[in-house]
Amino acid sequence: MKTERKKIRPDYYDKFSCIAGQCPITCCQEWKIAVDADTNRRWKKVFPPDTMPGCAKSQSLDQVSGDSKNCGKNLSTYTCMKDGIRVIRLDEEHRCPFLAKDKLCRLVLAYGDSILSETCTTFPREVHRFADHEEDTLMPGCPAVIDLWRHKEITFPSVVHSNADISSENTWTNVSEHTMCVEKDENKMAFLIREHILALLGDHTVSIEEALLESFYILLELYKNQPITPELVEEYFSPETLQQLRTAITQAKSTISSLETWEECNELLQDLAVNYRKEGLYEKFLTPVITQAEYYSQIFGRQGIHVGEDMDATKGENEAGQLWDRWRQFRNAFASYEPLLRNFLRNEVFSDLILPENFETEPEEADNLEHMVLQMQWIAIAY
């Protein structure tokens, strides 16, 4: 008899609802909207709604294809192949052609929700199916999701400890006393590590940057010290070990100049924007931001400031010093978003640190940890 997978969801999940035309942006613009094969087959038999540009109300399917160059023969003609997948062909403004001016979907208005592709039906929902359970989360690309994270700390159900939620107050001192909900031995340690990282990122006595660094260093050490046991994981996340790690990180940070960190962030921003700019995506947002970033790079080169110098020594004396003053002002203002950013990062860890495809081929424990180390780096880069 087949056992149904247990569904695991954060506490905010069921509170989500699409705000449709009230959305300040739209999820129907400037990204690859995939169309699955089943939907594409159905779309070949459905002609565009009357509200589509160039599609006259009185036209039949045959008339549409013959008389109007702007109206597609069927819904499938509004798709194309890109990077090996079928996607909706966006218009010149990188918007979905089915998106109306009121930010509502012409297809839904004409045919109902069942006409949509799997991507449009599920977004911003994300589902990860593991061998013994299923994890549902929401992606941060939706403003309605961000609103759910703004004012309240979110919690995540435990897949390792029975009847437990993971918040900043959760600590576990004897893992062996709890029932493991994950059946496969090689997967248990990965989920246990994830739960400790979630708790660490929820600890408001530790800065976000410190929590990210500590999580990354612990993952690296665990990767180097195979095999992993529950006792070893507990030791690495114990208050004593964390305090030693924080002391070491503080000492290391004192040897790194403020400029080195700032300059690296500025260069990273420009690197991350390359592919988007190449495809002409998010131009209204990225163009002024990257122009400013390039200007800052020129300031440092023009002022002759090099990595290793103390930015405080230049305070207010030149362009670079004035920039540094503005940077500190920004950091102070940015601090007000810390609760939201903690929720964002903890959701990223829950949804992206462990991916189902990394467990499908019965991998070695070392492979699991290697994937987790790489995923942790991507999560930190996003922050």
Predicted feature locations:
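Intrinsically disordered, low-complexity terminal tails and inter-domain linkers enriched
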Residues: C55-L75, S176-C181, I305-N318
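Extended, compositionally biased low-complexity polar/Lys-Gly-rich tracts
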Residues: D62-P97, C105, S117, N187-R194, ...
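N-terminal cysteine/histidine-rich coordination modules
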Residues: M1-D102, V108-S117, T121-I166
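Short runs of predominantly hydrophobic/aromatic residues within well-ordered alpha helices
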Residues: A20, P24, A190, R194, ...
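Alpha-helical structural motif
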Residues: V35-T39, L138, M189, I193, ...
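Hydrophobic, aromatic-lined core segments that form the binding pocket/scaffold
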Residues: T205-Y383
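Conserved aromatic-histidine-acidic binding/catalytic patches
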Residues: W31, V108-G112, F130, C181-D185, ...
